[in-house]
């Protein structure tokens, strides 16, 4: 079949989000033909070029989501901004089109400015939102010029009137003209996919299935492909756009009214994406809970874990060497969300109980002023808490805490970093899908983690969990494993078995291979051109008779109630191992999931 893969700020560009996952998906399903529709985030990303594409990628269409303020578009011809956006250039609307535009923006603004519902379902503004959203899409398709109109004085006046209207939220009512100008600019940027020239019978109209690699802007072309051509939409989210907006809000340059308007817009857009999608897959149940809160139907949700390459860690995982028995290892990007400050204070407690313990911190190369400042702060705290210690009068003092960069001569790769210790520690206060934990599980290492994001779901009962921002609890868990090598080995073996059964690339590809076939069989695209021969005459048996009848084969099937349980946790396994295997799988998961800490070590 022909798959339209929709991305935002990632594949096929050499840098960006979900790049590796998309590349593995495309390369792992060579029986399908892929058309790529990619939105870029910056001029720098476009300058980095594309990754090498496999032969079954037949077409690539790109468009920028960045504005001239972020960087001047380079090049003319097909790579220029105006050539890839059917925006009409300097086209101005006539009186009838101006009236249509004002009506659609008014409906959209009324929905966005309305008080957000505090329950789990979307507010009543969803109807107005879809009316304005699809109205603008049809206007852009017919007339172009939408990007100029959304930045016009008309848009600002409509937003100002909607924020003053009855039913608007208190925060929105305090918005100033500057806030409305800022929101109009952000709205134009997010709605830029409405003006693309992708919505023709030879473009998105020619694919059998649209697969959006994320929600938000990447899913907008899929919404329009379904509306204009009836193409089914599959949405995969490893993180929720609304959650990302909330996490980034404290560092944003916008005021509270603009942040509130953007949050409301993303909420309504997410609800519409989930409503129109034939199926929505979540990278973990933490994301799945966010999707349900944003209005997704639980019957349309499935959990498909992101596949990871286990081969690079096989040598460490199969080796009998358990690493440094007194060494704790932390691996990841050094940034405030990882809370290395709490880890250092926890290690101070560990050293009081275990004087021979060591802590090795392996970080990726630091990028940015914030990360550089944070690393310097962590080094200063480590020097204060753990001054260099000498074993004798004529030996050089050595600190029990070391900061090492992955890629150096001593630690050329991640596998060597995980092999350096017997216990892997994760101290984050914010975490989505904990990739470093899965990698350590592939290496057969016992773990101590904070209970954030999808941590408990990933480790099941194969590691210890402590509350975030609690150095004493984190230290107690580390001490327990350092003093019990048998338990450490048992948990490491169970962790490796769990990771190999749930988090490999093969599991991920098998899940999407089945999903593609399921969606096409339940909702095939019927095109008039396919029903006619070369002479324009009706083609016999172009569609089976069953396609015209209502029956169970024409309705989407609910997700399976049961999910496969890992073999090491199935019936007949060793009682102790089964007790530590985690909790009962959640309905609708394609891979077994742990919905709670269970009654094992966690």
Predicted segments, located by residue:
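Short acidic alpha-helix that forms the nucleotide-activated donor recognition element
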Residues: 271-275, 394-421, 442, 472-476
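Conserved donor-binding/catalytic core segment of Leloir-type glycosyltransferases
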Residues: 312-351, 359-365
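Nucleotide-activated donor-binding/catalytic signature segment of Leloir-type glycosyltransferases, i.e.
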Residues: 372-409
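Aromatic "clamp/platform" in nucleotide-sugar-dependent glycosyltransferases that forms part
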Residues: 429
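Short hydrophobic beta-strand element within catalytic cores of glycosyltransferases
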Residues: 444-449
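Conserved acidic donor-binding segment of nucleotide-sugar-dependent glycosyltransferases
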Residues: 464-471, 480-486
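A short, well-ordered alpha-helix in the C-terminal region of glycosyltransferases
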Residues: 473, 487-502, 508-518, 528-532
